[in-house]
Design a protein with these regions (language model features):
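Residue in the alpha/beta-hydrolase core beta-strand immediately N-terminal to the catalytic nucleophile
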Residues: 109-110, 133-136
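Active-site nucleophile loop of the alpha/beta-hydrolase fold
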Residues: 136-146
Length: 325
């Protein structure tokens, strides 16, 4: 299943979520993080490919009422400085380690990852197990997600991927020339009709940054590989370990669109493979759950935010109960 970049979305005024804090992570680089609420364990959120902080706007407030909730921008995204290194899962998790350490985020925390962010969250839990108390994975990417494809399916996926990469590269070039704005979207800038003025300003600024498009291009290159495991997948597979008895909830979208040229049989097989991958992630914990969320597309946190809020709440309660033993 080919993961495309996350569309922009907006539904309510969320000023607190957009008021971040730049943290020096070393090497002359700063990364943006915003933490809301109070309580323990902290919940740390990782958005998907091409995402932004507004991807969490429907869940940020309610979860901040339950505990401390921290949201951040990866290198090149939002207000975070770009990295000179490739945006591999290993490098992304390395950055997150130092950001959370320098920001003083208390460990262990609950890691919440969406889409590609789910693969990053999984690898982080593999690499730094003592820092992660539990996981909520929202329609996550996973190692081997494309290995069920026939030669015909691989060819279609390769064509879609090539078109996507070409468009991202085109948008990056336009951004470098300062030619992207809400007045000149050029097929790159998408501002929701229901966005507030503050959200529209924020999104327009994000789309206008060439570093964002460069980061997306690098992330996509390291996520997808025709007929083989990608660099990100290899990194996760090499580091894979049991999650023991840590609470893990994996949420799967119930609305999965058919790809161009895909037959009903191919689509059914792809959906089954996607769910099976999520089941395997949940099975790495003795307290893992794999749940299909009704009436939800890939953007579960926007379509069915209560499902995400409830999953985080349940993992938080499980972690707190374990501490009281």
């Amino acid at each position: 299943m080919l993961l495309q970049f996350t569309p922009a979305s907006a539904a309510s005024e969320t000023p607190a979520l957009l008021h971040g804090h730049l943290v020096d992570i070393g090497g002359g680089r700063h990364m943006n993080i915003v933490c809301l609420g109070r309580g323990s364990p902290t919940a740390v959120f990782e958005y998907g490919l091409g995402g932004n902080l507004l991807n969490w706007q429907k869940v940020a407030g309610p979860i901040a009422e339950l505990t401390t909730a921290c949201f951040y921008d990866r290198a090149g995204y939002g207000d975070s400085d770009p990295s000179s290194r490739a945006m591999t899962a290993g490098n992304v998790t390395h950055d997150l380690y130092w950001l959370l350490k320098k920001a003083g985020v208390q460990t262990p925390f609950v890691l919440v990852g969406h889409s590609l962010g789910g693969l990053y969250a999984t690898l982080y839990a593999n690499r730094f197990p003592s820092q992660v108390a539990g996981l909520v994975l929202i329609d996550p990417a996973f190692a081997g997600q494309d290995l069920d494809e026939t030669p015909e399916e691989k060819a279609r996926a390769a064509s879609i991927y090539a078109q996507s990469q070409a468009n991202i590269a085109r948008c990056a070039a336009l951004a470098r020339e300062a030619k992207l704005s809400s007045n000149n979207p050029a097929g790159c800038v998408s501002l929701p009709a229901n966005a507030t003025e503050g959200e529209r300003t924020y999104l327009a600024q994000q789309f206008a940054k060439s570093a964002r498009w460069d980061a997306m291009l690098s992330e996509s290159e390291n996520l997808h590989a025709a007929g083989a495991l990608s660099e990100d997948e290899l990194e996760e597979q090499r580091a894979a370990r049991s999650f023991g008895d840590k609470p893990v909830i994996v949420l799967t979208a119930s609305i999965i669109p058919t790809q161009p040229g895909e037959t009903p049989e191919e689509h059914a097989k792809s959906v089954g493979h996607w769910k099976a991958g999520h089941d395997r992630l949940a099975a790495r914990s003795s307290r893992g759950e794999s749940i299909v969320v009704p009436n939800a597309t890939h953007m579960i946190q926007l379509d069915q935010p209560l499902a995400v809020i409830d999953a985080v709440r349940r993992v938080l309660l499980a972690v707190r109960a374990h501490r009281r033993r």
